[in-house]
Structure formats: C-alpha cells, structure tokens
C-alpha cells in the first residue's frame, strides 16, 4: 500500500503535472461509455478522478466494479479540467486526476441513505442509528473541523494567559445543584452512589483555594433533565476559574477569548466592547434574560391605557398590579389574518397569558377586535408610546409582569422568524449583569439560588440576606449570543460565614449544609482567596458559529430527545449478575 500524498479535498492547481496517491470513499460514480468519472471523498472534500483506457485499461476495468462508499486507493497524474467541465463550487474544481492504478481497499454495502449533500432529507433517527455514515457528509465533517478549530483557539488563548489545564473527578458526590444527577452505584460501598458532575464547580473553587490561581478545563458535564433542541444529557463545557479577580476581570477575559475565537474560525473582527445590559433591563425591553438583539420589536409599556380606556381587561389588569405591554410588527398588518392571530393567541397561552389583544393601524385609526374601545385620545396615546404607523400590527398582553415578559418575549422571536427580520450573518454578543441572587420557589415555599449557592451577593446587598433576600443582587453575569445563553459566571463566596448564611437562606439546616458541603466549608477555614469564573457551553458555541439549529449536529455521537443512543442502544438492560454485585433490584 502506497503512502497518501495529500487529502482529496486539497488537490488544487498547485499539484498540476504531479503523480499523486489518494485514498478515500467513492462519493459517486458516472460511467460515460468508455470513460468513468468518480468523485473521491475524504474529510477535506471531494476531487474528481478519471478512468480512461488511454491511461490504464486495467484501472478502468476495476473502476467498473466500484460502487458508492467503497474505500479505494488511486494513483494518477493531476491535470487541468476542460474549461466546460470546471466546477467552481468546490475547491478542487479546476483539476482532475487521470488514474493509472486503483486498489479496492474495502467494499461497502448499499448505505441506508445517500451520503451526497443533495440528499440530506433523511429521518433523523436513521441518521443517528448510522451516525458513522452521517458523519461522512461534508456538511458535518466541516462542522467538526470548526469544532476542533474553536477548541484549539480557546486552549491557545488560555495557555497564553497562564491558565493551567487541570482535570477534575468524573465520579463525585451528589449535591443539590438544580437538575437531577446521573447516579452511579458503588460496588465496593454497598448502598452508596457516586454522581456524574453537573459541572466542576466545587472542584474548581477548591483548586483556587489550592493556589493554582488560573484554571481551565474543557470538560464533560451531565444533567438528567428534559431535553430540547439546544440541550443534551451530556455536554461539553469550557470551565474557567481565576483567583484575586473581580467581575470586570472575568468578563474582560471571556470577551477577549471569544473575540479571538470568532476572528480565527470565522474571519470576523469584533471591534469594541460587547454591549452590556442588566437583567432588569433585558426583561423590561425584551421579555427575556437572553435577548436576541439582532432585531428591534422591543416590549413597550402601555399600562397608561389601562387607566385611560374603558376596556375591562386592561382596566382590571392595572387595578390588580399587573401591567400591559405591546410589541409592534412593522408593516405586518396585511400579512396576518384573523386565523393567524388566533394561532398567535394559542402560542402566548403556552406561556401563561390569558389572551392576546391586537389592533391594526390604518390611516384613520385602528381596526381589530379591540379597536372600538380606543377613543381618539387613546389612539394618540398608543401611537405616541409605540411609534406605530399605518400598516403596523400592534399586539398586547395584559397580565402579571412575569407572564407579560415571558409571553411577549417568546412572541417577538416567533414573529421575527416568520417575518424574516433576523440577519443570520450577525453575531450579537451581549453581557447580562446584575442578576437576582435568589428566586422564590412557590412549590417548595422557599428561596432557591438563581445561579448556584456559591454565587456571592453584591457587597451592598449582603445585609439583605437577613431582611429582604428577594432584593439581593448577585455578582453574576451571563454571556448571550443571538438569543442563546452561551455561558454564565459569577464571583464566588470565599468566606465561610457568608457561605453558611447563604445555605441558611436557601433552607439548609447546619447539619444538612455540613453533610452536603462540609468539605467546602472546611476548606474555607484555611485561607480562601477571592475568586470567580465562567463556564461556556462548547456545543452551543459550535452550533451558533456553524449556523446549525440543532445541538445534536455539533456532537459526534449525540443522544436523541428521549436521551437514548440509537447507534449503541444505550441505555440498556444489564445482567442479573451485575445487578447482584451492586446489591440492586429492578422494580417494574
């Protein structure tokens, strides 16, 4: 077997006249009666190889037997294509290889679906079952090439900045961090369990107490939670922690790193600092803590209408401490029928809204179901507050503030997609800061950490932990990209007494706190430096930078929406002997 000269996708005019050896898969084969053309494929792309009896009759005979996905080795001379056969769509489109020798390395059965780019309309479950074939597609191959480039860029940046890459345990202790843990029974310790880490949070804090100063890890994390398009049970996190820093230091580091990544893998220079917005401002203007700022359509407070109008829904809402907000779809009045509006009403119902009121702005006033409730002065108020003009569609939700925010926040994104308002070429990064430290869980009747229990409150708000916990703000910051939460971080608590107070506010008894987190509280007794960090979702970053819409397309062997692996049929039953060794019994 000869040595490969180069990759198929890298054969360009620089190789003209050279005899080369290529190895790869038959992408397709065309028999033109006396001549056979084969597109040979590898991870870098496709090159056309030609079997011509003038060069080798023996090679032509073998080529007659090859089929799609055969693995072959070819030797031949690189020549320029005839002008009428040049393919400008591919990097190798100016050249072809006149084959003098071919060897079939391995045959292939007919694949369950075509690997050609033109034939990707295949049921996703079939693609996942034969994932090793799916990954041969150039589109996915390029996605994973970019994933490699992204991780390489991240590592280079962090290495240059003096960070140590340190691994943390995969088998660890189950602690209450929000999502359900994946549990691993211990054979040695009967009746006891390890947990797979939801994040290396506590270990990276312990590494700061150990004096390592700057840590990072590109690490697998596990959360047993309901899945959706941008979530997986196991995912990869870029985990970073730094000592003797404040919030500004961490945000600046994260920003510099992301700018470097985008420049190196996308060729896009991001000038200036990322925009910043407080949590309250994001919720007020966009109805979301991860707003997509690539388009306008902000939420506008029109609660004044509830005080001025004789419209019971609006009036009752304001009198019961609710609010009325509107969004304006510019020029969309004619695009949405009453049936369409009924569908949008059903959409906001999902988010708890009782209804969706709407009007269309025309030259002489308003039309629509509630248009008749608007007196002339009410119309003027609406147009002044919203800036709406003739041809615009104005939609209202009147309810509790959180319902208004969630429903209109989701609706603006839906409308933007339907109306084509989103510039898909934009990369709109945004920092969301000044988060609430705590949230109140109505079901559990207690406070829970908005991020995690180790986030420090703002110094000015520490006293509020004992008096008004719901008002305390955190030294926390999220990085958002195009409406997706890319990652989040915070300055951590580094004082044992404050950490114990935080556990108390969260409803832990001293005994429970010691049992769950005693190792951390003990570590705080031995000189903990101020520290903080951030964690970025690598899979999500790759998804956004490669313009994918599904997280599964960025993971080599992903799980389905029901957390199964169709390739290996995991999870699976295990033998009675294995269960017995673990002292486990399955109850159906």
Curated annotation (Swiss-Prot):
Cite the InterPro entries for this sequence: Aa-tRNA-synt_II, aa-tRNA-synth_II, aa-tRNA-synth_II/BPL/LPL, Asp-tRNA-ligase_1, Asp-tRNA-ligase_1_N, Asp/Asn-tRNA-synth_IIb, AspRS_core, GAD-like_sf
Catalytic activity reads: tRNA(Asp) + L-aspartate + ATP = L-aspartyl-tRNA(Asp) + AMP + diphosphate
Where it mainly occurs, coarsely classed, is cytoplasm
EC id: 6.1.1.12
Residues passing through the membrane, by range:
none
* Keyword annotations from UniProtKB, A to Z: Aminoacyl-tRNA synthetase, ATP-binding, Cytoplasm, Ligase, Nucleotide-binding, Protein biosynthesis
| Residue positions binding L-aspartate | 177, 223, 451, 492
User: Cellular location of this protein?
Assistant: Cytoplasm
Q: Which GO terms describe its cellular component?
A: cytoplasm
What family is reported? Belongs to the class-II aminoacyl-tRNA synthetase family. Type 1 subfamily.
- Quote the protein name from its UniProt record: Aspartate--tRNA ligase
Q: Which organism is it from?
A: Staphylococcus aureus (strain NCTC 8325 / PS 47)
């Amino acid at each position: 077997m000869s040595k490969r000269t180069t990759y198929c996708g890298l054969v360009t005019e620089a190789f003209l006249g050279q005899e080369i050896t290529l190895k790869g898969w038959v992408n397709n084969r065309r028999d033109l009666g006396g001549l056979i053309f084969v597109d040979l494929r590898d991870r870098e792309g496709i090159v056309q190889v030609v079997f011509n009896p003038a060069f080798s009759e023996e090679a032509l005979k073998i080529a007659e037997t090859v089929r799609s996905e055969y693995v072959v080795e070819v030797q031949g001379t690189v020549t320029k294509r005839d002008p009428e056969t040049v393919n400008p769509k591919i990097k190798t489109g100016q050249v072809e290889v006149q084959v003098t020798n071919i060897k079939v390395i391995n045959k292939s059965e007919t694949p369950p679906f075509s690997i050609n780019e033109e034939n990707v309309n295949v049921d996703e479950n079939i693609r996942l079952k034969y994932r090793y074939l799916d990954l041969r597609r150039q589109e996915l191959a390029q996605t994973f090439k970019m994933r490699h480039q992204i991780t390489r860029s991240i590592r280079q940046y962090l290495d240059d900045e003096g960070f140590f890459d340190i691994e943390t345990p995969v088998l660890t202790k189950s602690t209450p961090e929000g999502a359900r843990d994946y549990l691993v029974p211990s054979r040695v310790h009967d009746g006891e369990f390890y947990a797979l880490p939801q994040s290396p949070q506590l270990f990276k804090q312990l590494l700061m107490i150990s004096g390592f100063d700057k840590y990072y890890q590109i690490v697998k994390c596990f959360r047993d939670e309901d899945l959706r398009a941008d979530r997986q049970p196991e995912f990869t996190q870029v985990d970073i922690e730094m000592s003797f820093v404040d919030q500004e230091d961490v945000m600046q580091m994260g920003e510099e790193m992301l700018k470097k990544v985008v420049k190196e893998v996308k060729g896009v220079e991001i000038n200036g600092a990322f925009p910043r917005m407080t949590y309250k401002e994001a919720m007020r203007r966009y109805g979301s803590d991860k707003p997509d700022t690539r388009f306008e359509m902000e939420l506008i407070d029109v609660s004044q209408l509830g005080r001025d109008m004789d419209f019971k829904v609006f009036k009752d809402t304001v009198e019961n401490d609710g609010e009325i907000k509107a969004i304006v779809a510019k020029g969309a009045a004619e695009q949405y029928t009453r049936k369409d509006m009924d569908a949008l009403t059903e959409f906001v119902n999902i988010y708890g809204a009782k209804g969706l009121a709407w009007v269309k702005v025309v030259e002489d006033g308003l039309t629509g179901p509630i248009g008749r409730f608007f007196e002339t002065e009410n119309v003027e108020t609406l147009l002044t507050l919203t800036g709406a003009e003739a041809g615009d569609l104005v939609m209202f939700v009147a309810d509790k503030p959180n319902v208004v925010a969630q429903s209109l926040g989701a609706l603006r994104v839906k409308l933007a997609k339907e109306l084509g308002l989103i510039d898909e070429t934009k990369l709109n990064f945004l920092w969301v800061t000044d988060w609430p430290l705590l949230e109140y869980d109505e079901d559990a009747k207690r406070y829970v950490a908005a991020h995690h229990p180790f986030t420090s409150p703002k110094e000015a708000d520490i006293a509020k932990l004992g008096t008004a916990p719901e008002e305390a703000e955190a030294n926390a910051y999220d990085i958002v990209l195009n409406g997706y939460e890319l990652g989040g971080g915070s300055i951590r608590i580094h004082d044992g007494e404050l950490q114990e107070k935080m556990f108390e506010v969260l409803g832990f008894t001293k005994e429970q706190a010691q049992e769950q987190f005693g190792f951390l509280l003990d570590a705080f007794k031995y000189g903990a430096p101020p520290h903080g960090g951030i964690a970025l979702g690598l899979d999500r970053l790759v998804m956004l930078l490669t313009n994918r819409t599904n997280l599964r397309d960025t993971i080599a062997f992903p799980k389905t929406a029901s957390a199964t692996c169709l390739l290996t049929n995991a999870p699976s039953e295990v033998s009675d002997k294995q269960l017995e060794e673990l002292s486990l019994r399955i109850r159906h």
